[in-house]
Design a protein with these regions (language model features):
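Membrane-cytosol interface at the C-terminal ends of specific transmembrane alpha-helices
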Residues: 82-133, 139-148, 201-204
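Cytoplasmic-entry segments and transmembrane alpha-helices of multi-pass inner-membrane transporters
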Residues: 38-73, 102-105
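C-terminal transmembrane helix and the adjacent membrane-cytosol boundary/short C-terminal tail
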Residues: 143, 186-217
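Hydrophobic positions within alpha-helical transmembrane segments of bacterial inner-membrane proteins
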Residues: 25, 29-37, 41, 45, ...
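Short amphipathic alpha-helical coupling elements at transmembrane boundaries
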Residues: 13-16, 20, 55-65, 105-120, ...
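Periplasmic/extracellular loop-to-transmembrane helix junction in inner-membrane transport proteins
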Residues: 1-28
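Pore-lining and gate-forming transmembrane alpha-helices of multi-pass membrane transport proteins
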Residues: 20, 24, 160, 173-200
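Loop-to-helix entry region at the N-terminal start of transmembrane alpha-helices
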Residues: 16-24, 68-98, 184, 188
Length: 217
């Protein structure tokens, strides 16, 4: 069969591996984003959090952000075995620190008058966060979340090289075969680049929509 005619079949064949990588990145980003929100509220100095908690939350985020995903994934693969789970945990762990830092900075730049107003009316801390803080920070949270998802797709693909599954594992296999696996390697790169391009375009479009919405309010 002609190599050009077989290439679309290779794309279809490796599509499940790409979907697995996207699933790893999506779950890791969601879990990491939820954890980041918790640490972001605990690490913001202007949200009436118990003062000793603020520096502790910030240092924890610093450690999580600085810890290399690859090293953590290798350790988890040694403990849990080769599967997508170690990659998901490693990426989510790093995401908590990275997004937590960004979310915390967003929190510290809010207009606190609404928070103070609700406090004067007797609202609890959770009510103030829900009704005065979240409406202000969610647009920026979403923008950072989409950008982090794009980064995590690349990270998940790289972790596949060390046995974490997904498209990275297929790339490792085809590259290891050497001569004769060029078409398969090319198909995997095309799928990965196309997926990252689509995510980047969707992320850019969403950030533009958020910016336009904020400009109108």
């Amino acid at each position: 069969m002609d190599a050009g005619a077989a290439f679309p079949g290779l794309l279809w064949r490796f599509l499940p591996a790409l979907i697995e990588t996207l699933n790893i990145a999506a779950v890791a980003t969601i879990l990491g984003g939820l954890g980041a929100m918790v640490f972001a509220f605990l690490g913001a100095s202007n949200l009436n959090v118990w003062p000793p908690v603020v520096p502790v939350a910030r240092r924890i985020m610093d450690v999580m952000r600085a810890f290399p995903e690859l090293i953590f994934a290798l350790f988890l693969i040694f403990v849990l075995g080769s599967s997508p789970i170690p990659a998901m945990i490693a990426v989510a762990f790093h995401t908590v620190g990275a997004l937590g830092k960004q979310f915390s900075e967003v929190n510290e730049n809010i207009d606190t008058r609404a928070v103070e107003g609700l406090g004067a009316c007797g609202a609890s801390w959770f009510q103030r966060m829900r009704f005065a803080v979240l409406p202000q920070v969610l647009p920026n949270y979403l923008s950072y979340f989409m950008l982090r998802f794009e980064i995590n797709v690349r990270a998940s693909a790289i972790l596949g090289f060390v046995g974490a599954g997904g498209i990275g594992s297929e790339l490792r296999r085809t590259i290891g075969w050497g001569q004769g696996a060029g078409d398969e390697t090319a198909a995997l790169f095309v799928l990965l680049i196309f997926a990252i391009f689509l995510i980047d375009q969707a992320s850019s479009w969403m950030r533009q929509r958020i910016a336009q919405t904020e400009a109108l309010t």
